[in-house]
Amino acid sequence: MTDFLDTDYTQRFIFDDSDTRGELVSLERSYAEVLAKHPYPEPVAQLLGELMAAASLLVGTLKFDGLLILQARSEGPIPLLMIECSSEREIRGLARYHAEQIPADATLGDLMPNGVLALTVDPIAGQRYQGIVDLDGETLSDCFTNYFVMSQQVGTRFKLCADGRRARGLLLQQLPADRLKDEEERAASWQHITALGNTLTADELLSLDNETVLHRLYHEEQVRLFDVQKLRFHCSCSRERSGNALVSLGLEDAQALVAEQGGQVEIDCQFCNQRYLFDAADIAQLFAGAGVETPSDTRH
């Protein structure tokens, strides 16, 4: 059984009599960490949770060491949703929004009109890859399904949901022909599995554990469930990185910036709200190549 003391995890499963794999994700602590950093309205928090669930599912399908970045951009009330999830299963996220333009019952199309979804794989070694698809589905689940059908040409279905407390997701994906060689049999099996998956409601996914979800959907199928893979919230910001950003300006511009800001420049992390302060002595130390000691003025 799944140990719900571990509230943030993905869990793979496969169908023994079909060329289909699946994965489930549950996020509570990391989702709460992201929402605690900013006072997001409910519709924004919901979409951000769904995007976190999608990133967690996707990072498990990619064989790489590095960072997966999901960005949804639009011209509407939510200009940006952004999630970063590493191959180490560390996740963070943020949103930009215009609170006065967000009604409680808004749809994805209302909140992110003329939107695009960008999926970027940034490996430690190798070339960066990006795929882009329009946000033209009724839900983020539809948009991710469309992305895989169009760009990867792989049978894929997503079910994503979030309620401000918990984010959950279900991924179903076809595998290369192995158990079923006949194309008609493969198509019929895929249609059967996805039709059953489509009966799962958001309330069920948010409230039931993985074993119960799979029994509810596929009690007549041979399903094998693997061990959970844990996830956690982690922000990769640091004083060193902030200092490097100042170094990239050049000495004169960095000194001028400190002077303009009254003797102390402030760099805030947009993801976690960590604040890093640098004065003239810090700037001198940075450009002397000695690094910056961590003072008492690093704040949340």
Swiss-Prot record:
Indicate yes or no for the key word Chaperone. Answer: yes
Q: What is its main location?
A: cytoplasm
**Which GO MF terms does the UniProt record name?**
protein folding chaperone; unfolded protein binding
**UniProt-annotated location(s):** Cytoplasm
Q: What are the disulphide bonds in this sequence? A: 235-237, 269-272
Query: Its GO CC terms?
Result: cytoplasm
- Family annotation (InterPro entries): Heat_shock_Hsp33, Heat_shock_Hsp33_C, Heat_shock_Hsp33_N, Hsp33_helix_hairpin_bin_dom_sf
Q: Which UniProt keywords are listed?
A: Chaperone, Cytoplasm, Disulfide bond, Redox-active center, Zinc
Q: What does this protein do?
A: Redox regulated molecular chaperone. Protects both thermally unfolding and oxidatively damaged proteins from irreversible aggregation. Plays an important role in the bacterial defense system toward oxidative stress.
Q: Which NCBIfam families match?
A: PRK00114.1
Spell out the family assignment given in the record's similarity comment. Belongs to the HSP33 family.
Q: What is this protein called?
A: 33 kDa chaperonin
Q: Which organism is it from?
A: Pseudomonas fluorescens (strain Pf0-1)
Q: Which gene encodes it?
A: hslO
